[in-house]
Design a protein with these regions (language model features):
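Hydrophobic membrane-insertion alpha-helices, especially the h-region
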Residues: 1-11
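Intrinsic disorder/low-structure terminal segments
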Residues: 9-11, 39, 149
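Short, well-ordered surface patches within globular domains
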Residues: 20-81, 128, 133
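Generic signature of intrinsically disordered, low-complexity segments enriched in small/polar residues
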Residues: 13-15, 31, 43, 62, ...
Length: 155
């Protein structure tokens, strides 16, 4: 009985950013990504709809590892098509620990820095053909999950 009581008293639930901070975090992420594009004289991206990206971020928050496949085994392109979108899509994923909105902003900056060090992720960020980025974000359990779906939209 003592073990159960001590476990209850000392169980640790990490702080997480409030889900209401997600819109501001998405705006921040778009600015960080566009800052990288500007450094390389590439047109800034516009904000995408983020429906598929948000769903994937929420799914990934419940998983132990990052994956481009959703709970039904769909790839980013398939999820994008199921959402009624057309065109090319490429996806970058990241997860970082953060306990509040400011720490999550730092995590976003670090995630984009890491992506710029990875050849495929960097190519997605700097691809001049890309026109939009749909940013999915989920916070909980002391972490932020980021899904960046880079899109080529022809209007």
């Amino acid at each position: 009985m003592l073990i159960v009581i001590l476990t209850s008293i000392f169980s640790f639930t990490p702080n997480s950013a409030n889900p209401s901070s997600i819109p501001a975090l998405k705006t921040y992420a778009l600015a960080v990504i566009n800052n990288e594009r500007t450094k390389f004289h590439v047109q800034p991206l516009r904000e995408g709809a983020s429906i598929s990206a948000d769903n994937q971020a929420r799914f990934l928050l419940t998983q132990l590892t990052l994956t481009h496949l959703d709970s039904s085994g769909n790839t980013p392109s398939k999820r994008y098509a199921l959402n009624g979108e057309t065109g090319y899509v490429a996806e970058n994923l990241s997860v970082y620990h953060c306990g509040d909105a400011d720490a999550c902003k730092t995590a976003i900056s670090l995630a984009v820095d890491d992506m710029m060090e990875d050849l495929e992720s960097r190519a997605n960020i700097l691809n001049p053909e890309m026109t939009h980025v749909s940013t999915g974000m989920a916070v909980g359990n002391g972490k932020v999950v980021m899904v960046f779906d880079f899109e080529v939209r022809r209007s």
